[in-house]
């Protein structure tokens, strides 16, 4: 079983990363994508045109699709991200833009509805925050929608919050 660990932690001393490492401990088949080291660019019009042309020709060999293929092939997805501004760092949204590829992680049915193609049975969203976050964690809610669209049936939320509140 392959676990894809999408690491959206900004530094190695991250409390979120510590929680993720504890979750992943003992799992021998972890592929890690360190987003802050990838320098992924947000899509501009030129990239969109290139991607559309490749998708229309089902030309999946371009390196532009490597992250999407990796995501689609994983048995489990673990998203590790700090709680920033009610959700997550922008680098994680940029990653999802690169992963969301019609024909790899989902496709459209004849009725025009998206249908997931991912192998994963579960997506685990791990986060930490200095204050409260469970009342409004739009990051997890976003990934629940992504999991549904990509055909991943289970989502789980693991959070350590109030880490900077004295007395908690």
What are these regions (language model features)?
Residues 77, 123-124:
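Short, well-ordered beta-strand core segments
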Residues 99-114:
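Short, acidic/small-residue loops that bind anionic groups at enzyme active sites
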Residues 8, 35, 127-128, 160:
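Cofactor-binding loop segments of dinucleotide-utilizing enzymes, especially the Rossmann-like FAD-
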Residues 114-120, 150-151:
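Short, conserved loop/helix-junction motifs that constitute active-site signature segments
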Residues 134-168:
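Glycine-rich phosphate/pyrophosphate-binding loop and the adjoining helix
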Residues 1-97, 101, 165:
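N-terminal beta1-alpha1-beta2 submodule of the flavodoxin-like/Rossmannoid cofactor-binding fold
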